[in-house]
Design a protein with these regions (language model features):
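Acidic/polar, glycine-enriched structural segments that form the non-catalytic walls/loops
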Residues: 1-102, 134, 173-189
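Aromatic-rich carbohydrate-recognition surfaces in CAZymes
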Residues: 105-109, 113-224
Length: 224
């Protein structure tokens, strides 16, 4: 049974010994984009493609050791590549550029997985750096944590700068480092004040809330 309510669809299926394959497309942009995101492959075909893709990623590092040690090592490498998530084309505000979401969170990954990805998956890391700069251009600040197209509530810090510095030190090309420097200087010098200025909150509280969102608290005191 299927029912459509206000552009939403749900279905109730009663199955016994029948094997059912369901294809689902999801999009943050539109229903049309969701339809495009429905995978045309069969389950077995997609499984084969995924195995091939992951083998290509994981085979960039070869180690020796026991089967247990290898399993632990490659499981760790696999986990480093799960987040941030490539959602290019799925941000309704700037869908034409590389876009990564679910940075959780850069104050941990700038010193662990991101320097590793710079070495073993340069294209992905380049896209992530460019995504940080795209977020700066559209939202005003680079995030320290981000999910659901929104900079998350964070502890203080500007760790995206360290990610960019690592890319620059390793000679990564394809990044607008002049724009990156502009973003870094703003992070270091300009306290965020993007909470609605017409709200009933006083300016100090609005500044505190904005700083919490962007992880930019205490800049005035730090720079004084």
């Amino acid at each position: 049974d299927g029912v459509t309510i206000q552009d939403s669809l749900y279905a109730i299926a009663h199955l016994s010994d029948i094997h059912a394959n369901v294809k689902v497309g999801i999009s943050f942009v539109s229903m049309e984009k969701a339809q495009q995101n429905v995978c045309p492959e069969t389950f077995d075909g997609q499984l084969s493609n995924l195995r091939k893709a992951w083998n290509e990623k994981l085979s960039k590092i070869e180690i020796t050791g026991t089967d247990k040690q290898k399993r632990m090592f490659y499981t760790g490498i696999y986990h480093t590549m799960l987040m941030p998530v490539d959602k290019s084309g799925e941000n309704p505000h700037f869908s034409a550029t590389p876009y990564y979401d679910d940075y959780y969170a850069i104050w941990d990954t700038y010193r662990t997985s991101m320097p590793l990805l710079t070495l073993i998956d340069e294209d992905r890391q380049r896209d992530m750096v460019n995504s940080l700069l795209n977020i700066y251009e559209h939202d005003g600040y680079m995030p320290d944590a981000r999910s659901g197209n929104w900079n998350g509530r964070t502890q203080g810090g500007s760790n995206a700068e360290i990610v960019i510095a690592d890319a620059f030190a390793k000679g990564m090309e394809g990044i607008n480092y002049e724009l990156a420097l502009q973003a870094m200087i703003k992070d270091a010098e300009v306290p965020p004040m993007d909470v609605d200025s017409d709200s009933l909150l006083d300016s100090a509280l609005r500044e505190s809330l904005a700083a919490e969102r962007h992880g930019r608290g205490g800049l005035k005191e730090y720079n004084s």
